[in-house]
């Protein structure tokens, strides 16, 4: 899980979602997981 000021999809399978008011990226590739901090 990467914590970044700006999250963006890395590949086609990355999805940008909102959880508890936080923007997150979920993907099949665990390296692509990000959340906004």
UniProtKB/Swiss-Prot annotation:
GO terms for cellular component: cytoplasm; ribonucleoprotein complex; ribosome. Keywords: Ribonucleoprotein, Ribosomal protein. SUPFAM superfamilies: Ribosomal protein L36 (SSF57840). GO terms for biological process: translation. One of its GO terms (molecular function) is structural constituent of ribosome. PANTHER family: 50S RIBOSOMAL PROTEIN L36, CHLOROPLASTIC (PTHR42888), LARGE RIBOSOMAL SUBUNIT PROTEIN BL36C (PTHR42888:SF1). HAMAP family: Ribosomal_bL36. Belongs to the bacterial ribosomal protein bL36 family. This is Large ribosomal subunit protein bL36. The lineage of its organism: Bacteria, Bacillati, Bacillota, Clostridia, Thermoanaerobacterales.
């Amino acid at each position: 899980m990467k914590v970044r000021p700006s999250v963006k999809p890395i590949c086609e399978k990355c999805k940008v979602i909102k959880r508890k008011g936080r923007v997150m990226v979920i993907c099949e590739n665990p390296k692509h997981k990000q959340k906004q901090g």
